[in-house]
A protein has these predicted regions:
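Conserved small/polar residues in nucleotide/adenosyl-binding loops
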Residues: 349-355
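Extracellular loop-to-transmembrane helix junctions
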Residues: 2-25, 37, 67-107, 111, ...
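Membrane-water interface regions at transmembrane-helix termini and the short interhelical loops
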Residues: 66-72, 93-96, 146-154, 168-190, ...
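Loop-to-helix junctions at membrane interfaces in multi-pass transport proteins
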Residues: 2, 36-41, 45, 62-79, ...
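Residue-level recognition of pore/gate-forming positions within transmembrane alpha-helices
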Residues: 14, 53, 83-86, 132, ...
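Membrane-interface "cap" regions at the ends of multi-pass membrane proteins
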Residues: 1-61, 174-177, 202, 209
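Transmembrane helix-bundle signature of multi-pass membrane transporters/permeases
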Residues: 50-54, 83, 186, 190, ...
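Helix-loop-helix module between adjacent transmembrane segments
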Residues: 77-174, 249-255, 344-348
Length: 359
């Protein structure tokens, strides 16, 4: 029964995404509207759609799984690096690319680079477009593959059928609504992701026996709560987390400066003077969300130790939020529906990869 309710919640969620595409299609009157939403995004939509499309499945699966296996150091230093990268990207790049792209009437990044550097022969256009296509193909494919694996493991769906359904949903709302549909659905996704993180962390703490029980379990593991050591689950020992590891982890934040789907949000905001508001919203949301996601991993390990959910190893640890949500669904129909919404959010984080690649 719980699986049927979960499936209903996921179908409802995906139906809402297609509906957003239909609504947004009525607001597109030219190419500029389709590719940049007519440069009419407000500061909240700009901030939250950028970060939801950026975080994708890493926030709900990668970070909790990392914390579950190794403790605070790896996940927390990553969170700090990503928060700093987010802030600096908004501070350094956002306003300039908004002003220049608008001044040159450029609606895509290759078009912007070509006009910005006087590329009359369109060599820069071809190179930048080729780089985006080449590197976004595996990025997009990973999103489709993740959707297939998620629905297969969660509901027993055929792997290939799940990928096809995911592709149909993406193509429908992207071709109908374009950039505005992608940005609006990402805004909704950011709200649902926030809801999912809050529900899972509160439910997990209660089921673990309280925050005291969670901390007691974590303290018993060597290096688990140490920012300069990491826990090694295989040997139940700790390892050094030194300077070079910290620097390399912090360097994750440098990736933001070249992410096309984030740069397009900068180009699409209605007023460059509102980017300061977007920067604050984005940075705060990213940092808090990553810290909560780290907490879910720590809480999840306690649930495993208590026998409430299975002990996870290796890449299985990335399904910790799925396991907790599935356990939530066993309580009653309302809990099952809430779990379905959470799992729909998880599934949609995989869809944001191909969505932003297409748009």
């Amino acid at each position: 029964m719980s699986n049927i309710i979960i499936l209903a919640a996921i179908i409802l969620y995906l139906g809402m995404v297609v509906w957003i595409g239909v609504i947004c299609s009525k607001k597109n009157s030219d190419v500029g509207d389709f590719y940049l939403g007519g440069r009419k995004l407000g500061p909240v939509v700009t901030a939250m759609s950028a970060e939801a499309s950026d975080m994708s499945s890493y926030l709900l699966m990668g970070v909790p799984g990392l914390a579950y296996l190794t403790g605070l150091a790896d996940a927390t230093w990553t969170a700090i690096g990503l928060a700093l990268g987010t802030y600096l990207n908004w501070l350094i790049v956002a306003k300039k690319i908004r002003l220049y792209s608008h001044g040159y009437q450029a609606i895509t990044l290759p078009d912007y680079f070509s006009k910005r550097f006087g590329d009359d022969k369109h060599v820069i256009t071809l190179i930048s477009a080729a780089l985006i296509v080449i590197f976004f193909i595996p990025y997009t494919a990973s999103g489709f593959a993740a959707c297939g694996k998620l629905f297969n493991s969660l509901l027993g769906f055929d792997y290939h059928a799940a990928m096809i359904v995911s592709a149909v949903v993406i193509v429908l709302y992207c071709t109908m609504g374009g950039f505005l549909a992608a940005s609006t659905s990402d805004l909704v996704q950011s709200i649902i992701m926030t809801f999912a993180l809050a529900v899972v962390v509160i439910f997990g703490i209660v089921q673990a026996g309280g925050m005291g029980a969670v901390l007691d379990n974590a303290k018993a593991l060597p290096g688990y709560l140490d920012m300069f050591h990491t826990h090694i689950a295989e040997t139940n020992s700790s390892g050094d987390y030194g300077f070079f590891k910290i620097v390399s982890t912090l360097a994750w934040g440098l990736g933001y400066f070249g992410m096309p789907h984030i740069l397009l949000r900068f180009m699409a905001i209605e007023d460059e003077n509102k980017l300061k508001i977007s920067r604050r919203i984005a940075t705060v949301w990213v940092f808090i969300s990553l810290i909560v996601a780290t907490g879910i991993g720590v809480i999840g390990l306690t649930l495993s130790k208590n026998g409430i959910i299975d002990t996870l190893t290796g890449s299985e640890s990335e399904t910790i939020i799925v396991k907790i949500s599935h356990y939530l669904s066993t309580f009653n129909p309302v809990a099952a529906f809430i779990a379905g919404i959470i799992l729909a959010a998880v599934s949609y984080t995989h869809l944001t990869l191909p969505t932003n690649s297409l748009v």
